[in-house]
Amino acid sequence: MSRRPLGKLRIIGGQWRSRIVDFVDGDGVRPTPDRVRQTLYDWLAPHIEGAEVLDLFAGSGALGLEALSRGAAFVSFCERGAEQAQAIREALKKLGAANAQVRQDEALALLARETKQYDLVLLDPPYASDLLPQALALLPPRLKAHNRV
C-alpha cells in the first residue's frame, strides 16, 4: 500500500517558528489554520510553558507541535490513523523533540483507560462527528487542577 500525498505544515511560533513539517493529506485531515492557531496560542500563552499536554484527535499534529514549540514540557499525541500517527512521529524526529509520544489509538478508548492527568487537553475532532460531547464527558478524571481544555 502506498502512502498518501503529504501536505506541508508551518509551525507559527516558539522555538520552531517557520519550520515546515509534513502531514498526511487525506481522510479529512487538515491542519488547524495558522490564524486560528495564533489566536488559540495567544490565549493559552500563560499556560503553555512547562505544561503536560494531551492532543486528542491529533490529525496533522499541528496543535501539539505548536505547544511543544512554545515550551510545553510534554505532549502526548493521540491519532487513530496509522499514516497520520507516523507522520507526527517523523515531524517530531525532524524537529528533534524527545518530550513527546504518539499513540495510535481511538481517542475515546484512550480517555476511558488513561490514568495520567494533564494540564491542557487539545480537542479538535473531525468536524462532522459527534465525538466532542463524548470526549468532554470522559475528560474530568484526566485533568489536573486549574486545567484547560
Give the residues covered by each predicted segment.
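Class I S-adenosyl-L-methionine-dependent methyltransferase catalytic core
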Residues: 1-149
